[in-house]
From Swiss-Prot:
Primary gene name: Cracr2a
Native source species: Mus musculus
EC code(s) of this entry: 3.6.5.2
Biological process annotations from GO: activation of store-operated calcium channel activity; adaptive immune response; endosomal transport; positive regulation of calcium ion transport; positive regulation of JNK cascade; protein localization; response to histamine; store-operated calcium entry
Keyword terms: Adaptive immunity, Calcium, Calcium transport, Cell membrane, Coiled coil, Cytoplasm, Cytoskeleton, Golgi apparatus, GTP-binding, Hydrolase, Immunity, Ion transport, Lipoprotein, Magnesium, Membrane, Metal-binding, Nucleotide-binding, Prenylation, Repeat, Transport
Pfam families named among the record's database cross-references: EF-hand_7 (PF13499), Ras (PF00071)
Amino acids binding Ca(2+): 91, 93, 95, 102
Top-level EC class: hydrolase
Lineage top rank: taxon: Eukaryota
Family annotation (InterPro entries): EF-hand-dom_pair (IPR011992), EF_Hand_1_Ca_BS (IPR018247), EF_hand_dom (IPR002048), P-loop_NTPase (IPR027417), Rab (IPR050227), Small_GTP-bd (IPR005225), Small_GTPase (IPR001806)
Coiled coil: 202-376
GO MF annotation list: calcium ion binding; GTP binding; GTPase activity
Name assigned to this protein: EF-hand calcium-binding domain-containing protein 4B
Composition skew (Basic and acidic residues), residue ranges: 1-10
């Protein structure tokens, strides 16, 4: 016979028969108006049927085939066989496809049949609930009669098992015992045996627990006794340590007291000495007090003397300031004089340049005149043609090369005069010193050599230009003209015999000796008209170009000054110079560019020009390794003459001839880095780095001069000394 609790458990295991389900059914029975079945709306049903048809007809054919229905296998929880059964049920005519009307009609019939089945199941549930309600009411009446007997039996069981000592709440066990007694009576004895075993084990565990608690209490008591013993021992040790510490402290205090007594006695003795010293100092102070009056009187005298000295110092300061102002005025005047001197040097240099150009034009005129006279001479001496040819061939072996200065100026030479005799005359000429600088003059001398046999050519005078190497270059050609006029002028002629040799043929005597000093040279008037008056430069620097022969110094200077290149130029003899004006940082800078001869016999002249140079340019040939090896010798000459106080420009020329290079760029850079030089590789032929290198050197010279001017020592007024006595 089932109890209410048993019905609740069994109903909870069956779906649709739980408390909620039974309650809902009873509520429906109590309210029969809620049992009305709400039918779905007809339009909603038709709409759902159409949506399901469109889902099946994904291709939009207007009908559904069996394959379309099988595609829903993945979307619906139905197997293929079930889907085929649905298709067969909807296909009433059996034509193998479903139209929208057939699908909607079949779907509505299926829906209505499901609703009818649901109503029948609902009726069955209502009937079952009514039966359960009747059964429940009968069970409650039986429980009322049996409660008293079951409670007595359960209490007897608990007393027999001794559960009161183990369990505090017997409700759970009572409920389980009653459930088994009602539902499963045959299992009740097993349950009671299980309870007997469990309670026996619990009783045993309880006894073990009591034993463990007793052992634990004994252990705690023993531990407390041990702790108490340790505490007493610690108290005894602390007491003994305290007594020892007090004993040591007493001894230490006594020793400290004795030490302090000794120090006190020493301090008393020191105090006595200080008292004696104080008495002595008081006596000295009294003596010093007497001296104080004397010192005051002396200080008064010194104060008066100090005032007089201060007034004298002030007068001296005023005089020193006046002297300083005069010194500054003199410095300004000296600076102005220096600038005027530089401008004068520049103007004289320009005049010398124009004089040189005029002389060149005069030489051209004389050459033309000599050619005309030579033609007349050839007609006159046709009979002696063979003898003259032999004489010219003998002179070809002793020809000399024309220099850029001495060669371009008229260099009078005899017909039979050799190059060695020429050099001997030049260097044996007396050197002249000038307070201004370079002394250049023209000297006409008679040639002692004889003319050609039978030609009747008299002795001629040659034009000589001697350059002083002792002082600054300041030509004095404009200070009164020449002592002797230009009387005779030889001509060097290049006679090409199949491009193999040159012959120097002497020109006949020109009877052009005037009685008065020479005036303007031929073509000089035209030169003054063609040349534009240059602007006054702000700075003037002298730069000396040195290097082995044939490295291209003259061609480089011609490229700088004339912007052209002339191949096959003759070697420089002696010294030549040019003037180049450049603009550096908005300032006009005039550069005197001195071209020196590279031959060994002219090096003594070149080295003398280093002393007054502002800068030096050392050049070598990129295609000749020997010229680069000579650079160190040139640098040694510069260092011996001027030390390291002037900048040096290292130039590697003939960069245009890269195929024949023998000196790598790295060697030049390394040499420049070791000796602190300015390094450029240039080309006189193409003009590459010609202007750039010169501007770099000019800018460096200008910066050095600005630094020297700014570092000029300014003498300031001396600081006024304070008097010692106020």
């Amino acid at each position: 016979m089932a109890t209410p609790s048993g019905r609740e458990d069994s109903s909870s295991q069956t779906p649709g028969h739980g408390k909620q389900g039974s309650g809902a059914c009873v509520e429906q029975l109590d309210h029969p108006e809620k049992l009305e079945v709400e039918m779905p709306d007809q339009s909603a049903m038709w709409k759902k049927a159409q949506e399901f048809f469109q889902t099946c007809d994904s291709e939009g054919k207007g009908f559904i085939a069996r394959t379309d229905m099988q595609r829903l296998h993945q979307e619906l929880p139905l197997s293929l066989e079930e889907l085929e059964d649905v298709f067969d049920a909807l296909d009433a005519d059996g034509n193998g496809f479903l139209t929208p009307e057939e699908f909607t009609t079949g779907f509505s019939h299926f829906f209505f049949s499901q609703n009818i089945q649901g109503e029948e199941e609902a009726d069955q549930q209502v009937a079952q609930l009514q039966e359960e309600k009747v059964y429940q009411s009968r069970g409650e009446e039986d429980v009322g009669d049996m409660d008293h007997d079951e409670e007595a039996q359960f209490q007897m069981l608990m007393d027999r098992l001794g559960a009161q000592k183990v369990l505090e709440d017997e409700s759970d066990v009572r409920q389980l015992w009653l459930q088994l007694r009602k539902d499963e009576p045959h299992l009740l004895s097993n349950f009671e045996d299980l309870l007997t075993t469990i309670f026996a084990q619990l009783q045993e565990a309880h006894e073990q627990k009591n034993e463990l608690e007793c052992a634990l209490r004994k252990k705690i008591a023993a531990y407390d006794e041990e702790i108490q013993h340790l505490y007493e021992e610690m108290e005894q040790q602390i007491k003994s340590e305290r007594e020892q510490f007090l004993l040591k402290d007493t001894e230490r205090f006594q020793a400290r007291s004795r030490e302090l007594e000794k120090k006190l006695s020493a301090k008393e003795q020191e105090l006595e000495r200080l008292n004696q010293k104080q008495r002595k100092l008081e006596g000295q102070c009294a003596a010093l007090h007497n001296d104080k009056h004397e010192t005051k009187a002396e200080n008064s005298k010194l104060r008066l003397t100090n005032q007089e000295l201060a007034r004298e110092l002030e007068r001296t300061s005023h005089q020193l300031q006046e002297a300083q102002q005069q010194l500054e005025s003199l410095q300004r005047e000296a600076c102005e004089l220096q600038q005027e001197k530089e401008m004068e040097v520049y103007r004289v240099t320009e005049s010398l340049q124009r004089e040189k150009s005029g002389l060149l034009k005069q030489l051209d005129f004389l050459r033309e005149r000599n050619k005309h006279l030579r033609d007349e001479r050839d007609i006159t001496f046709q009979k002696d043609k063979a003898a003259k040819a032999n004489t010219a061939a003998s002179k070809a072996s002793r020809k000399q090369r024309s220099g850029s200065v001495i060669g371009k100026y008229v260099d009078g030479r005899g017909i039979l005069r050799s190059q060695s005799e020429e050099e001997e005359d030049v260097f044996s000429a007396p050197r002249r010193r000038s307070s201004v600088g370079l002394s250049a003059y023209l000297q006409a001398e008679e040639d002692l050599g004889t003319g050609e046999p039978g030609s009747g050519v008299p002795r001629r005078q040659a034009l000589r230009r001697i350059i002083s190497i002792e002082e600054d270059p300041l030509p004095q050609l404009l200070e009164g003209g020449f002592e002797k006029p230009l009387s005779r002028c030889p001509e060097e002629e290049e006679v090409s015999d199949q491009g193999t040799e040159r012959q120097s043929v002497a020109a006949p005597v020109l009877d052009l000796i005037p009685t008065s000093p020479r005036g303007q040279p031929v073509g000089k008037e035209t030169l003054y008209k063609e040349e534009r008056v240059p602007s006054t430069p702000d700075r003037l620097f002298k730069i000396v170009f040195v290097g082995d022969s044939a490295v291209g110094k003259t061609s480089f200077l011609r490229r700088l000054c004339e912007a052209r290149f002339s191949p096959g130029m003759a070697a420089t003899v002696g010294i030549d110079y040019r003037v180049k004006t450049v603009t550096v940082d908005n300032a006009q800078v005039a550069l005197q560019l001195w071209d020196t001869a590279g031959q060994e016999r002219y090096r003594c002249i070149s080295q003398q020009f280093f002393r007054k140079a502002d800068g030096v340019a050392v050049m070598y040939d990129l295609t000749a390794k020997q010229s680069f090896l000579s650079i160190r010798q040139w640098l040694s000459s510069v260092e011996e003459a001027v030390g390291d106080r002037i900048p040096v420009l290292l130039l590697g020329n003939k960069l245009d001839n890269e195929k024949e290079r023998e000196v790598p760029r790295g060697l030049g850079e390394q040499l420049a880095k070791e000796n602190n030089l300015i390094f450029y590789e240039c080309s006189a032929c193409s003009g590459h780095n010609a202007q750039e290198s010169l501007l770099h050197l000019a800018r460096l010279l200008k910066e050095q001069e600005d630094t020297v001017r700014n570092d000029t020592i300014q003498v300031g007024p001396p600081a006024k000394k304070k008097s010692c006595c106020g």
